[in-house]
Design a protein with these regions (language model features):
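Acidic carboxylate diad motif detector
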Residues: 78-189, 317
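Surface-exposed helix-capping loop/turn segments at secondary-structure junctions
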Residues: 68, 123-127, 334-336
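Well-ordered beta-strand positions in beta-sheet-rich domains
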Residues: 33-35, 165, 183, 212
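Positively charged, helix-rich recognition surfaces that bind polyanionic ligands
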Residues: 3-7, 30-33, 40, 191-428
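Gly/serine-rich nucleotide phosphate-binding loop at the start of the catalytic core
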Residues: 2-108
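Stable alpha-helical structural segments in soluble proteins, enriched in small hydrophobic residues
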Residues: 60-63, 109-122, 377-387
């Protein structure tokens, strides 16, 4: 039976949401990953966690099976209270009916998340983005938790729906006097089970450095700054990873064997280990750049196209693409400026302005005017030069447009929002 909310309840919800939105303006979002301790939790806890993800898969597949043609019309009528018994298939593809024992909070959140995903797919399809048909899930590795049902008990224990006291590692990261848990997710990885917490912290004023820097992406030196500081973000495959890949290839004919399953599990765990190292290096480089410069300039290099070249393997083993995307997110806050990739940052001399041809094997830029500098450092300095010039032109052009649109007799630039929109529109 559908619950009908009274007008008083709707007004309370609306007022609470408005209060939350006002509070979020003075807060900053941080995500912390807590690992469920393997040594200090009984085996029954992990059996229950495994069962939660198994039943979450059954619930999602039950939602998708409501319509034979996989249309999403009847999925929105799905009520978790009316589907306590679901039909799934065993390894021999025989239908089996099972009763859902998943905690109601996780059950409701799984259903709501799937409906939200379908709405987002519909919006993407309306924008012209190609989306495929809805397909059944072979596994589910993330279960959302409704806000308000996750609490930190002490320095090493938390409580989530279905688990009154869960021993986790990583709570030492949350050592703040004021914080608010906004969201939580239960995640399964190759290395174990995790609880990801989205924490809202009070904003602290940032001390400006009054410095700008240009970045140059390359192969030998992955990142070079205009201050001649280099970063290496390449992480090669480990020998153990290569060994496991060979072992998995040997057992490719034994598709259902336990030996192949164990090898796949070890290989996934090693891939996650290498990915974590790459992610750690990316975050450290990003933090160093953001804390050193107020504005970062870089070219819009197509890192994806570099994968098709003879040095593509080195690019794939680095985190250049992820780091570039993370820096581009600073464009909205005017802390990053992206230049066109066609600007001659490597060929142009910053002293006389001459454009000289230079080969890939030449590591030092030399001009007839006597200017000489290492290739990557020279490119980063030119990126900074082009960036400051183009940014000044964009600000001047956008300011002129805003001034022409203002009524006569008005003073100052009170229309700050149109100025910012015009600045973003005139970026290269």
């Amino acid at each position: 039976m559908e619950t009908v909310r009274s007008e008083n309840t709707k007004a309370k919800i609306k007022a609470s949401m408005a209060e939350t939105h006002a509070r979020r303006k003075s807060q900053i979002c941080r995500v912390f990953e807590l690992k469920v301790s393997i040594r200090h939790n009984p085996k029954s806890v992990f059996d229950k966690l495994s069962n939660c993800f198994r039943e979450a898969k059954w619930i999602i597949n039950d939602m998708l099976s409501l319509s034979k043609d996989n249309s999403d019309n009847s999925i929105f009528d799905y009520k978790y209270t009316d589907h306590k018994n679901v039909v799934h298939f065993d390894k021999d593809k025989n239908p089996v009916t099972s009763t859902i024992t998943l905690p109601s909070v996780l059950h409701r959140a799984t259903v709501a998340q799937k409906k939200t995903d379908i709405v987002n797919l519909s919006k993407a399809k309306a924008k012209g983005i190609k989306v495929g048909a809805l397909k059944f899930k072979s596994e589910v590795n993330c279960i959302p938790i409704i806000t308000g049902f996750t609490k930190i008990l002490d320095a090493s224990h938390i409580t989530i729906p279905g688990f009154r006291k869960l021993k986790v590692n990583g709570l030492h990261q949350i050592e703040f006097e004021e914080y608010e848990i906004a969201d939580a997710k239960l995640v399964r990885k190759a290395s174990g089970y995790y609880v990801k917490l989205t924490i809202m912290l009070p904003k602290t004023p940032r001390t400006p450095t009054y410095r700008s820097g240009g970045l140059d992406f390359g192969i030998k030196n992955t990142i070079t700054t205009s201050d001649n500081k280099t970063y290496d973000c390449k992480v090669q495959e480990t020998e153990y990873l290569k060994y496991l890949s060979k072992m998995l290839n040997r057992h490719k004919t034994e598709k259902d064997s336990k030996r192949r399953w164990n090898c796949r599990k070890q290989l996934a765990r090693e891939h996650e280990h290498v990915a974590n190292i790459r992610k750690d290096i990316r975050n450290k480089i990003y933090h160093d750049l953001v804390s050193s410069y107020d504005v970062i300039y870089m070219q819009d290099e197509q890192i994806k196209n570099w994968h098709q070249t003879w040095f593509g393997k080195q690019v794939q083993h680095s985190c250049m693409g992820a780091l570039k995307q993370k820096i581009k997110m600073l464009v909205k806050s005017d802390r990053a400026f992206v230049l066109s990739k066609w600007l001659p940052t490597t060929k142009m001399c910053p002293v006389c302005g001459t454009v000289n041809a230079i080969g890939l094997d030449e590591r030092t830029y030399q001009c007839d005017c006597g200017y000489s500098k290492p290739r990557d450092w020279h490119s980063a300095c030119n990126v900074l030069l082009f960036g400051t010039t183009k940014r000044a032109e964009c600000v001047e052009h956008a300011s002129a447009e805003v001034a022409s649109s203002m009524p006569s007799g008005s003073t100052g630039f009170a229309q700050a929002a149109p100025l910012k929109r015009n600045l973003e529109a005139h970026r290269l």
